Amino acid sequence: MPQLIPFFFFNQVVFTLISLSFIFFVFSKYILPWIVRLYVSRNQYNSL
């Protein structure tokens, strides 16, 4: 099992951190602002 070999374990940890950082960046920069704008616009439209 390669997960138990320290070199591969370190490689998996680094890859996981990089992947999670990338996903966090994409969500915070692109996905979440789009959802918030949509929510606010619908909320303002319904309050009229």
Curated annotation (Swiss-Prot):
It is a single-pass membrane protein. F-type ATPases have 2 components, CF(1) - the catalytic core - and CF(0) - the membrane proton channel. It is found in: Mitochondrion membrane. This is ATP synthase protein 8. The gene is ATP8. Mitochondrial membrane ATP synthase (F(1)F(0) ATP synthase or Complex V) produces ATP from ADP in the presence of a proton gradient across the membrane which is generated by electron transport complexes of the respiratory chain. F-type ATPases consist of two structural domains, F(1) - containing the extramembraneous catalytic core and F(0) - containing the membrane proton channel, linked together by a central stalk and a peripheral stalk. During catalysis, ATP synthesis in the catalytic domain of F(1) is coupled via a rotary mechanism of the central stalk subunits to proton translocation. InterPro entries: ATP_synth_su8_fun (IPR009230). The keyword Acyltransferase does not apply. The chain crosses the membrane at residues 13-32. It comes from Trichophyton rubrum. The keyword Membrane applies. Keywords: ATP synthesis, CF(0), Hydrogen ion transport, Ion transport, Membrane, Mitochondrion, Transmembrane, Transmembrane helix, Transport. Belongs to the ATPase protein 8 family. One of its GO terms (cellular component) is proton-transporting ATP synthase complex. It holds the Pfam family Fun_ATP-synt_8.
